[in-house]
Amino acid sequence: ISTRPSPTTADDVLHDMDGRIAAVIDGGPCQIGLESTVVGIEGEEIVIYRPGGTTKEALSVIAPTTVDSALAKDGAHPKAPGMKYRHYAPSAPLTVYTGEADKVVEEILSFAEKTDKKYGFFVSEETARLLPKGLPLFVWGQREDKESFAHNLFSGLLYFNRHPVDAIIGEGTDTAGLGLAIMNRLTKASGYHIVVEKR
């Protein structure tokens, strides 16, 4: 279970635990959708060991803030729990496209025409409107709404465990604000299969 996406609703918990617990107290979906930010103090700096709901920008108001360089390296050893191995992974392989928006959309749409595999799409509202009807699809929110993306991130990945596909094609975001935590989780969930599209 520790390698799977984190459940953020009572339904997700019940599905994940699959009869191993008697009941779940449902307090509603998690407000933020991501785990907490884990930090340490090194010298006079705040170091983010695991990005979460409290952003680097918010912490920088308190003191100079950096991000643990190990977070960006496959095989490195970050200090925070859950950052040391493949984590948050859905059942199907995930590839995430990010970067220049038009190129990202073009690449994602190309998979809608392929018939070699059953593809699921984890995308923004704007991209979803361009996809053919009837494809396995989870919409995480409007492209610029990172709060919705964070809120729906794990539910979206778990959706494809309940609606199996051969591969998941995801749309990422930039790393400003909550985007740092979102892309950290997607990087882990995809096993570092992140494609950056440029002009």
Identify the function of each model-found stretch:
Residues 1-199:
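Active-site-adjacent structural elements in enzyme catalytic cores
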